Curated annotation (Swiss-Prot):
Record organism: Saccharomyces cerevisiae (strain RM11-1a)
A biological process from GO: mRNA transport
Name under which the protein is recorded: RNA annealing protein YRA2
In-chain residues carrying the UniProt-annotated modification N-acetylmethionine: 1
Localization terms from the record: Nucleus
Length: 203
């Protein structure tokens, strides 16, 4: 009889366990999208950042250019064109006028021309002023934006105060009411106390 009772209990337990469905939950850190930051799965932001870095590495650098600066304002564009004409026709040229001087940018198909221009005109005197000629590597727009964003982020972090604080600490301000209370709470002079004591004694 005991054996039969055990079989009945066992069968009922088996039936209940077979009918019971086990609900599987995702890990909470994955549900809350904390998994990528903990190293369980790649995040979209990290993937985009990596893709951008790969694109920047795959993109070839821009051709080098020549920059002529500290040109007097009274030097005409035709004079500058005549100076460069002997080295060939540039494929890119741009002139910037500032308050004090002018600056020219040139790009040539043959990069060897740049060295010749530097040797020829660096320190050259033009209208009683010495001009400067140098070769530089231009940057792409997204590279300049990334550098600007990094500088901006650094400035914001420095303006927040000490690490761990969300806002910059502000000096304690005393309201007008508190100021009035402070004035009323100031101790009176000895003469005033004596006068009050005399009035009290006479009364």
């Amino acid at each position: 009889m005991d054996k039969a009772f055990d079989e009945i209990i066992g069968n009922s337990h088996t039936d209940s366990s077979s009918n019971h469905k086990v609900t599987r939950y995702r890990r909470r850190d994955l549900r809350n999208e904390l998994g990528p930051r903990l190293g369980f799965a790649p995040s979209d932001a990290a993937s985009r950042s990596k893709d951008r870095l790969y694109r920047e590495r795959e993109e070839p650098p821009l051709p080098k250019r020549i920059r002529i600066s500290k040109i007097p304002l009274d030097v005409s564009d035709y004079t500058l064109d005549d100076m460069i004409k002997e080295f060939g026709s540039p494929i890119f040229s741009k002139i910037f006028d500032n308050k004090e001087d002018r600056t020219c940018i040139y790009e040539f198909e043959d990069p060897e021309v740049l060295e010749k221009i530097v040797e020829r005109y660096n320190g050259h005197e033009l209208h009683n002023a010495k001009i400067e000629v140098e070769i530089y590597q231009p940057q792409r727009k997204h590279s300049r934006m990334n550098a600007h964003n990094r500088r901006k982020q650094t400035a914001q972090e420095q303006g927040r105060g000490r690490p761990g604080s969300h806002y910059r600490q502000r000096p304690n301000r005393v309201s007008k009411k508190n100021k009035g209370r402070e004035k009323n709470n100031t101790p009176t002079s000895v003469e005033a106390l004596d006068a009050e004591l005399d009035a009290y004694m006479k009364g």
